[in-house]
């Protein structure tokens, strides 16, 4: 299996759409694999959007100016939403709508702060995973390893395309709401001094606010989507690395063919490989700890608030559908992380089984046997995606959250009745 030919593309549009073109090229060529890991491509997308705040980007005046500009736009949008709350007091449906988008913007702001603080450390992790991806595998495991890398890349890209399709569709619906809901003049309910948001009093200011709202939220939701894909893809690459390790272990005896020296070298290499995965996992959990905590709190708030608003707006189907979409997107976001966290933990548990299958008590010296025992013992502890003190991201805890949401829904339904 070969990598696609590398072409020098530095334009922002090439960077932004690069992973989609790459996935199509890999899909069309059965023997080809991606030139880079998903996290590498998503980092390029963030650079194309002009909001990846590592030391390299901070040295570019044009990029810094752009970051200040869009940050001011986001802060202005948040301030106008807060100012608009005063008009929604007494109307549960509109107040809930304002709070949903205020919470979303606060979440985006937190992600911006996170990247400003940890972009350099993320670069180190991405580069380490990129190096692992390009390691050459020799022996009987070669074909299966390359096919695994290709399949993982295509599956994740299919998920990214699906996620972005829903995200952009949602934004288009929100931007178009003033055209089919008479009571709404802007995509998001805001209030400005001197009634600048009123189209009958200030038509030019209204158009500027409308365009600013639409472009700012479209930009930052796309940015947020890329950021989430990057975060998940880091753990997905660790999952892929664990899968590659398992494949190599299951082909270890066939590769060495009784050569004890080769067996010892390969076993030590794989032990160090496993140790590197553990260290990268610990580093990722440390970096994302605050982001995970904020993410779980925001998801719980959005789901609970959306459930309440769906019940409160049951006499207004259009508003109820809008909140239902928000709730489904929030649950989709949480399930996105939970599923990949679950895959990561389960794949890490397979390593101990693969080491056990590779162990042959009739082959090797005592030092080799001790190495196998050490490897099996260490691999029995599963790796997890976790934010202390919260439980790990997996499907079991995801179902627990769904049960809590259902309990809240029941209480709210009884209260409103």
UniProtKB/Swiss-Prot annotation:
The keyword Lipid biosynthesis does not apply. It is a multi-pass membrane protein. Expressed in olfactory sensory neurons in the antenna. Residues 1-62, 120-152, 228-290, 338-393 are cytoplasmic. Interacts with Orco. Complexes exist early in the endomembrane system in olfactory sensory neurons (OSNs), coupling these complexes to the conserved ciliary trafficking pathway. Belongs to the insect chemoreceptor superfamily. Heteromeric odorant receptor channel (TC 1.A.69) family. Or49a subfamily. This is Odorant receptor 65a. It comes from Drosophila melanogaster. The lineage of its organism: Eukaryota, Metazoa, Ecdysozoa, Arthropoda, Hexapoda.
